[in-house]
Amino acid sequence: MSSQETTSAAASERSTGAGLSITILALAGFVIVTTEFLIIGLLPALARDLGISISNAGLLVTLFAFTVMLFGPPLTAMLSHLDRKRTFIVILLIFAASNALAAVSSNIWVLALARFIPALALPVFWGTASETASLLAGPKRAGKAVAQVYLGISAAMLFGIPLGTVFADAVGWRGAFWALTLLSALMALLLALSMPRIEPTAKVGLVEQAKILRDPFFLANLLLSILLFTAMFGAYTYLADTLERIAGIEPAQVGWWLMGFGAVGLIGNALGGRYVDRSPLGSTMAFALLLALGMSASVPAAGSMPLLAMVLVIWGIAHTALFPICQIRVMKAAPQAQALAGTLNVSAANAGIGLGSIIGGLTIEHLGLGAVGYVAAVVALLSIAVAWMTSMQKNRAAL
């Protein structure tokens, strides 16, 4: 065999190994996101079982989100220099142990602890998984690799949460957490067996990494993510209510419409990963425009089921495409501290999700449910303006 053939074979083998590792990271992401959001469908059952109100049970969701937002960036900055393979395995074992603790919890305080611990680990996973996927795939395929990892989010939203809720109805909410315990441990084992060792990045101090927070271009990209997630979840949070109360869809059928929304989102995930590599800010503006069109057209289209379905296809594709677009765009804005940048984007996304839900709720209270899509579309258009100004700022800096 010639040296050229040997080199080609070695490159092919490395590519196959990298692809397998990225796929398993996506599966691990599926388990982690399911762990985060499955509890939403379990709240009534666990509230009854633990003898607490549904509002108090709902604080478990708030606890998780705020923990991710507050602790994610400093923890990721401190741990970003560690061996990635070991980091992922430890995180998945933490999720396994936490889910087991949730399954045996006898009161809300134990369950709160079982939610607090994995919330500390989740942003570290997403920050390092995104950067690791980029390293494994190489700079030319970084966007597609991050999109593949983010496919775990889409799959969890589409299959994990509804199927997990059905599973919990059959075997109880504790059984659902036991299932997640086993899946988390399985993902840790698969990564241990398949992922190549990735050389730790040079240890950079917190002060050095935090310098990205003084970079106007990076901060503009972070603000852009907050605006986009505010727009996305300002309307998406109330989509089920919109389908039922405005479109007149039977409650038993709303779930299938939401499943369809998630299914077309898989297309958006692939498109976002493809185009963000070519133009991070350009792809942001394009999909933000589609998002605004979809959200604002949802109420006018509600009188026709075929037209509504077409609008939701546009909305669903744009909504899911913006997940990998935001992540890789923010990471590209801080190449010297990508893990911290990725985690800051996760925190920004959580801030946007919370802010969007609040804005949507206030819109319903003062303007009615039918105005939610329009208000969210205005925020999306504002994000386009910010993206355009950020692009101009980058072009001026390059001169």
Question: Residue locations for each model-derived region?
Answer:
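Helix-loop-helix hairpin linking two adjacent transmembrane segments in secondary transporters
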Residues: 110, 139-193, 238, 242
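Conserved MFS/SLC helix-loop-helix module at the cytosolic interface between two early adjacent transmembrane helices
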Residues: 70-109
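Cytoplasmic helix-loop-helix junction between adjacent transmembrane helices
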Residues: 114-152
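Helix-to-loop junctions at the C-terminal end of transmembrane segments
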Residues: 71-83, 268-280, 364
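Helix-breaking motifs and short loop linkers at transmembrane-helix boundaries and internal kinks
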Residues: 51, 83, 104-110, 248, ...
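Intracellular juxtamembrane helix-capping segments at the cytosolic ends
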Residues: 125-137, 321-334
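Paired small-residue
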Residues: 94, 98, 109-117, 306-314
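C-terminal transmembrane helical hairpin of 12-TM major facilitator-type secondary transporters
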Residues: 282-326
